[in-house]
Design a protein with these regions (language model features):
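N-terminal leader/targeting and accessory segments in enzymes
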Residues: 1-102
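Phosphate-binding loop of NTP-binding sites
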Residues: 98-137
Length: 138
């Protein structure tokens, strides 16, 4: 699923949740089509999350070469990553886990809103009914 989310909209989202430290890159109108935290999974138009204990700046370089439009990092790594990729749009957040949840949902077009919900109640037959419903792909 693709979306029309931009870097500016992602920065606004993080700011509205009080976790934006710095951001709003010059390329604020760049379209974001997804998000990834593994440089091997980055696609053109993705935002790349720089996180984890084993994170290496080479992962950011690889993600940008693959087509990442920007990266998101925490304040502890911001200076080092700015040195690694000085021309890349950077967004710095105070809460990486929350940012990953918010940005991923927005970048992928909120697929969680398209999940059908079915309630099955009663004394007997709930498991059978649930199984039968799963087979007809509601």
């Amino acid at each position: 699923m693709t979306s029309a989310t931009t870097l500016l909209e992602l920065c606004d989202l993080l700011d509205a949740n009080d976790i934006l430290v710095s951001g709003i890159p010059e390329e604020a109108d760049a379209n974001v089509t997804g998000a990834a935290c593994d440089s091997r999974c980055v696609r053109k138009g993705n935002v790349f999350f720089c996180k984890g204990r084993a994170f290496k700046p080479a992962f950011l370089t690889s993600a940008l070469e693959t087509g990442a439009v920007a990266y998101i990092c925490d304040p502890d790594h911001a200076e080092e990553l700015t040195t690694t990729a000085p021309s890349a749009p950077a967004i710095v957040t105070s809460d990486m886990r929350r940012a990953m949840a918010l940005v991923s949902a927005a970048a992928f077009g909120r697929p969680d809103l398209d999940v059908p919900q079915v309630g099955i109640t009663g004394t007997k037959g709930k498991s059978t009914t649930a199984y039968m419903l799963s087979l007809i792909h509601i």
